């Protein structure tokens, strides 16, 4: 099989749905995309290792390796996309549509298209002249649980010198981002008839106490923690969603609040979760058994790469850009456990998760050149 042309690679990736979602009716296996990548990288001489991701709906990771041993470069990305709103897209999400010097399609920049760039770079390099191994990692479920990246981190099956995650950064290297925590506080009261409010335990009234304590925790985080690389330097706490009760004439028997917390580098998610529980401890003592705090999903740690890293210096030299921090999350905390890691890929983050997601065609040639040089300079002595 001859490797398809760049635009055909792109078309095939976009044509193959790989949506991940916590809603089961929307969740799709990524195996067809994994199989495409396996065939293409195998054609270029890479050895292929495909593994199932535990506790997922038919999801798989792929590691394609050219060379032997540790060291070298890892180019990483996720194969899944977010769901799409059919009413907001003006183009078919699963067709690569060219218009106004742009390629439209779901995953063009977030981030299946990155693999087409990597394949094109590998096609134009004499891989036999590389002195160090080149690995390609394609993961599952980044858009939901990051189960694929977590599985790779747990396996510890290889250790490159450097890793580049090809999320859309307009090819500006990213060296730091905050983490993400989604937490639930559930209040269980005792319902009853509203004509006698004292004859029950009103969960909304207890939640009122909870929000007061959390506002104090907000202030504490701002006063005691800071990372000046970020525009908002402190770990944040946001009230995102609350629901409780079912009727005006009933005492509210249950109420639930969902909050978002963003740890900064140096602050472990476990530490923030402990502070959250400590803030609510007085209410827990006042109302034994009424307050339950739990993760809506497993926390994602913050990430930071040492600015003295040779990888950062190389990325800055190749792109002409200075490394930056960002506020969104990636798989970097899990990849970074084994090597120096940056986030850098084609396309603007402003297009991610948006209707009519697109890649600006003017980015293609510069991006291909940067990725090719990155491979050559990272994998040669």
From Swiss-Prot:
Gene Ontology CC entries for this record: cytoplasm
InterPro entries: AcOrn-deacetyl, ArgE/DapE_CS, Bact_exopeptidase_dim_dom, Peptidase_M20, Peptidase_M20_dimer, Peptidase_M20A
Cofactor binding description: Binds 2 Zn(2+) or Co(2+) ions per subunit.
Binding residues annotated for Zn(2+) 1, in chain numbering: 78, 110, 167
EC number(s) from the headed UniProt entry: 3.5.1.16
GO biological processes: L-arginine biosynthetic process
Compartment(s) where it occurs, according to its Swiss-Prot or TrEMBL record: Cytoplasm
Sample GO molecular function, one term: metal ion binding
Enzyme kind, highest EC tier: hydrolase
Principal localisation: cytoplasm
Needed cofactors: Zn(2+); Co(2+); glutathione
TM stretches of this protein: none
Key words of the record: Amino-acid biosynthesis, Arginine biosynthesis, Cobalt, Cytoplasm, Hydrolase, Metal-binding, Zinc
Binding site for Zn(2+) 2: 110, 143, 353
Catalytic activity annotation: N(2)-acetyl-L-ornithine + H2O = L-ornithine + acetate
Pathways involved: Amino-acid biosynthesis; L-arginine biosynthesis; L-ornithine from N(2)-acetyl-L-ornithine (linear): step 1/1
Active site per database record: 80, 142
rRNA processing among keywords: no
HAMAP family (alphabetical): ArgE
Subunit structure, as described in the record: Homodimer.
Described purpose of this protein according to its UniProt entry: Catalyzes the hydrolysis of the amide bond of N(2)-acetylated L-amino acids. Cleaves the acetyl group from N-acetyl-L-ornithine to form L-ornithine, an intermediate in L-arginine biosynthesis pathway, and a branchpoint in the synthesis of polyamines.
Family membership noted in the UniProt record: Belongs to the peptidase M20A family. ArgE subfamily.
Name this polypeptide is given: Acetylornithine deacetylase
């Amino acid at each position: 099989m001859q490797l398809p042309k760049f635009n055909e690679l792109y078309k095939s990736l976009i044509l193959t749905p790989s949506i991940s979602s916590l809603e089961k009716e929307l969740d799709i296996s990524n195996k067809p995309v994994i199989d495409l990548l396996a065939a293409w990288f195998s054609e270029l001489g890479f050895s292929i290792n495909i593994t199932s991701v535990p506790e997922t709906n038919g999801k798989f990771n792929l590691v394609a390796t050219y060379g032997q041993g540790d060291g070298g470069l890892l180019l990483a990305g996720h194969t899944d996309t977010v769901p799409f709103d059919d009413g907001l897209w003006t183009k078919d999400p699963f067709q690569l549509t060219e218009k106004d010097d742009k390629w439209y399609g779901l995953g063009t920049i977030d981030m299946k298209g990155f693999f087409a760039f990597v394949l094109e770079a590998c096609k134009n390099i004499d891989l036999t002249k590389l002195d160090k191994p080149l690995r390609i990692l394609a993961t599952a479920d980044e858009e939901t649980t990051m189960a694929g990246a977590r599985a790779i981190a747990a396996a510890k099956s290889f250790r490159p010198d450097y890793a580049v995650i090809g999320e859309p950064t307009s090819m500006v290297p990213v060296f730091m981002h905050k983490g993400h925590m989604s937490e639930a506080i559930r209040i269980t009261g005792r319902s009853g008839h509203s004509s006698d409010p004292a004859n029950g335990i009103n969960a909304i009234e207890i939640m009122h106490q909870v929000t007061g304590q959390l506002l104090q925790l907000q202030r504490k985080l701002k006063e005691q923690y800071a990372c000046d690389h970020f525009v908002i330097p402190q770990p944040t706490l946001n009230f995102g969603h609350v629901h409780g009760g079912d009727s005006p004439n009933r005492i509210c028997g249950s109420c639930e609040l969902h909050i978002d917390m963003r740890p900064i580098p140096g602050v472990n998610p476990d530490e923030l979760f402990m502070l959250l529980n400590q803030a609510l401890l007085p209410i827990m003592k006042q109302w034994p058994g009424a307050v339950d705090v739990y993760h809506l999903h497993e926390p994602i740690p913050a990430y930071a790469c040492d600015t003295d890293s040779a990888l950062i210096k190389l990325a800055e030299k190749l792109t002409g850009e200075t490394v930056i921090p960002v506020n969104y999350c990636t798989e970097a905390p899990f990849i970074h456990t084994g090597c120096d890691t940056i986030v850098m890929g084609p396309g603007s983050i402003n297009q991610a998760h948006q209707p009519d997601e697109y890649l600006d065609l003017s980015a293609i040639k510069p991006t291909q050149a940067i990725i090719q040089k990155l491979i050559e300079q990272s994998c040669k002595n």
